[in-house]
Amino acid sequence: MFNSPLEQFEILPLLSFGANLFDFSITNAMLTTCVSLSFFLFLFYCLFSYGLNSFPTRWQLVLEGLYTSTAGLVWDSVGPRRPKVFPFLFVIFSFILISNVQGLVPYSFTITSHLIQTMVLALTVFIGVIIIVLAHGFHMLSLFLPGGTSIVLAFLLVPIEIVSYVFKPLSLAVRLFANMMAGHTLLKVIAAVAWAMMGSGGLLLIAHIVPLGVLVILFGLELAVALIQAYVFTILSCIYINDAIVLH
């Protein structure tokens, strides 16, 4: 008997303790989040502590590639405030990428497969967007009403623009959550099929090579999806921030 492929997304308490209505339990999701952040901080601590080498190591090449690719993304998508928002967007991109890849490690936990986690990331971006928009004062209303719009169309366009703007963080969060959850579920299903065929014996023992090969291919695709989803989340965040800056 095999467990449900969705059990891998269950949040389990590793250390339970609390007081009255408050629960301070340490869960697998919390532990994975701390590991992702610690790994990110450790890499860059080592890089800046030991300095940059004229003949870079593999880790230095990876980190420099991560930095320059994110910088190019922000520089191309964000307006005049790009030096101020780059550190934030770089941390967002790195954290999502590390979390996505870490979720592919056996017996690990994919925190980006939970809507609450991706929603927190999306709301963090949109809190910054709202702060930038409010800095424009009354000019921020042009974000919901394009110039030259007639009064008749304004009554139709303004509610539509407001609703679409409110749902942007939700779409940003759901896109990341759904892709990661679907990919990991598919991997678990294919792995369960291959394992069942191996345990059946006979011709199925030989035929299990087929789903096993599919599993290897899907694992490679899931690595690509982990990078693509981090990129998509970051590029959309750049676009939303740029729209808030130029009110477009």
Swiss-Prot record:
Instruction: Kindly state which keywords UniProt assigns to this record, in alphabetical order.
Output: ATP synthesis, CF(0), Hydrogen ion transport, Ion transport, Membrane, Mitochondrion, Mitochondrion inner membrane, Transmembrane, Transmembrane helix, Transport
The membrane-spanning stretches of this chain are 29-49, 85-105, 115-135, 143-163, 176-196, 201-221, 227-247
Gene3D superfamilies (alphabetical): ATP synthase, F0 complex, subunit A (1.20.120.220)
State the membrane topology. Answer: Multi-pass membrane protein
Alphabetically, the GO molecular function entries are: proton-transporting ATP synthase activity, rotational mechanism
Cellular component terms, GO, for this chain's entry?
mitochondrial inner membrane; proton-transporting ATP synthase complex
Q: Which CDD domains does the UniProt entry name for this protein?
A: ATP-synt_Fo_a_6
Q: Does the keyword Membrane apply?
A: yes
Q: Which Pfam families match?
A: ATP-synt_A
Q: Where in the cell is it found?
A: Mitochondrion inner membrane
Q: Main location per UniProt?
A: mitochondrion
Q: Does the keyword Transport apply?
A: yes
Its subunit composition reads:
F-type ATPases have 2 components, CF(1) - the catalytic core - and CF(0) - the membrane proton channel. CF(1) has five subunits: alpha(3), beta(3), gamma(1), delta(1), epsilon(1). CF(0) has three main subunits: a, b and c.
Q: Which family does it belong to?
A: Belongs to the ATPase A chain family.
**HAMAP family, alphabetized:** ATP_synth_a_bact
**What is the purpose of this protein?**
Mitochondrial membrane ATP synthase (F(1)F(0) ATP synthase or Complex V) produces ATP from ADP in the presence of a proton gradient across the membrane which is generated by electron transport complexes of the respiratory chain. F-type ATPases consist of two structural domains, F(1) - containing the extramembraneous catalytic core and F(0) - containing the membrane proton channel, linked together by a central stalk and a peripheral stalk. During catalysis, ATP synthesis in the catalytic domain of F(1) is coupled via a rotary mechanism of the central stalk subunits to proton translocation.
Q: Which PANTHER family match?
A: ATP SYNTHASE SUBUNIT A
This protein is called ATP synthase subunit a
